[in-house]
Amino acid sequence: MNNIIDGKALANEILADLKLEIQELKDKTNTSPKLAIVLVGNNPASIIYVKHKIKNAHNIGIDTLLVNLSTNIHTDDLILKINELNLNNEISGIIVQLPLPRSIDTNKILSAVLPLKDIDGFHPLNVGYLHSGISQGFIPCTALGCLAVIKKYETNLSGKNVVIIGRSNIVGKPLSALLLKEHCSVTICHSKSQNLSKISSKADIVIAAIGSPVKLTAEYFNPESIVIDVGINRINGNKIIGDVDFENVKSKVKYITPVPGGIGPMTIAFLLNNTVKAFKDSYSTVCH
């Protein structure tokens, strides 16, 4: 049995459905969703990620606007740029490519994006909706991608023991909220957690999101584990690897996502799904 999860294939299914939906929306409204991407500076990894997002968007009929700004821009000036996008009715969704330069107040910037256009789900209002169990607003795309993969391979999540290794606002925290809603028993671990391998090796599902290359070896899992590797670590210049020691772990668990080709494509698919959702929400608001 092939136990390596093909995230690219799953993402392509989502993108194919979105392409059809966008064409229907275009026929109905005579307009298309448009995604604005704010890129500050010239971080090589960020440039690659942005290119992937733009390429996938264009492939399914989403227009894009790339706003490329200098590394030296001040927080207040960046907020002014974001406000321009907030007020532009042609823009359905806005993302600010992270990380931002250290001189910029990231929290202020993420809070400046209009919640209705915050397709990354990072605005405090959208975060509050998610953690309050309110079905409104936007949910971070990586967390949505992880949940979709898990549900594809584990149809009944109720009562499952899940260990999330990593407590970021992008993955760990939002994913914990989604899994609690599915009635999982969720444990969040992090760099200060003790006896980590002892805790994670008892879990049905382990999500690795610590950002430390091949940190998690076979002792962290059991033969029935579903392993979701969210880590994206660049080594030796261009090679990308995950947080899990993939080569030595893959034969010792039930299912595992590779890096690359696992959660990355799913994240982009759900980013574009959120863009379409924002477009539909704005259009229905205008029509009513």
Curated annotation (Swiss-Prot):
Pathway listed: One-carbon metabolism; tetrahydrofolate interconversion
CDD domains given in the database record: NAD_bind_m-THF_DH_Cyclohyd
GO molecular function: methenyltetrahydrofolate cyclohydrolase activity; methylenetetrahydrofolate dehydrogenase (NADP+) activity
Gene of this entry: folD
Family from the record: Belongs to the tetrahydrofolate dehydrogenase/cyclohydrolase family.
UniProt cross-references to SUPFAM superfamilies, sorted A to Z: Aminoacid dehydrogenase-like, N-terminal domain, NAD(P)-binding Rossmann-fold domains
HAMAP family in alphabetical order: THF_DHG_CYH (MF_01576)
Protein name: Bifunctional protein FolD
One annotated GO biological process: L-histidine biosynthetic process
Reaction it catalyzes: (6R)-5,10-methylene-5,6,7,8-tetrahydrofolate + NADP(+) = (6R)-5,10-methenyltetrahydrofolate + NADPH; (6R)-5,10-methenyltetrahydrofolate + H2O = (6R)-10-formyltetrahydrofolate + H(+)
UniProt keywords, alphabetically: Amino-acid biosynthesis, Histidine biosynthesis, Hydrolase, Methionine biosynthesis, Multifunctional enzyme, NADP, One-carbon metabolism, Oxidoreductase, Purine biosynthesis
